[in-house]
């Protein structure tokens, strides 16, 4: 099985967790962040790590987007950077863009820009933990 490489933009806790899980499962991952220290620290968990400002369309184009089918935009805390990067990725024609949103409004804007999959990590994790807890409660009660 040949798995297409994935680009992860934003190597904070969410981005590096996602990227390292992908690489440990055999996926080639290009990690991108504007912070050189973060890129340096993340490099061991990635196939390739690059310092670049993804809000700059020219800088993003230099990363070889034509070869990338899947991008995860893991920048959530910086609304402007998230929106600019999402716009650049969509305009570049990336066929599968996932993006992290920190609020319903942020998610709505990302969808309006054309992002294919919007992820709300805290909301989604809260729901998942609630379902796990409910399963345990039902199992342990007579």
Label every PLM stretch briefly.
Residues 134-142:
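Residue-level detector of conserved catalytic or cofactor/ligand-binding positions
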Residues 15:
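N-terminal Rossmann-fold NAD(P) dinucleotide-binding loop
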Residues 4-8:
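Beta1/beta-strand and adjacent pyrophosphate-binding region of the FAD-binding site
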Residues 22:
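Aromatic pocket-lining residues of Rossmann-like dinucleotide-binding sites
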Residues 28-29, 97:
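Short beta-strand element of Class I
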Residues 33-34, 101:
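Conserved acidic E/D residue at the C-terminus of a beta-strand in Rossmann-like folds
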Residues 40-133:
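Phosphate-bearing ligand-interacting subdomains
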Residues 11-12:
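Glycine-rich Rossmann-fold phosphate-binding loop(s) that bind the pyrophosphate
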